[in-house]
Design a protein with these regions (language model features):
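Absolute protein N-terminus
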Residues: 1-2, 75
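Short amphipathic
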Residues: 3-10
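Amphipathic, hydrophobic secondary-structure cores in small proteins
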Residues: 12-57
């Protein structure tokens, strides 16, 4: 999937990945896509909570090599 901005939060635990994702999305224009890479197992739950609060969209989530990858579209 194509993305505009990438944020690698590998090695960081809650709440840091979600705070960084929220800040990154706030700086983006509507329709742009943020790719977030995380090693925090709770990140999936956190990304869903973030998009529910902000109105942004979780387009896709995958995992590979113990990393969780999320694609979020800015509302």
């Amino acid at each position: 999937m194509q993305f505009t901005v990438e944020l690698d939060t590998s090695g960081l635990l809650c709440p840091i990945p979600i705070i960084k994702a929220k800040r990154a999305l706030a700086a983006m224009a509507g329709g742009q896509v943020l790719r977030v890479v995380s090693t925090d197992p709770g990140a999936a739950r956190d990304m869903l909570a973030l998009t529910a609060k902000t109105g942004d969209t979780l387009l896709e989530q995958t995992s590979e090599n113990k990393k969780f990858i999320f694609y979020l579209r800015k509302a």
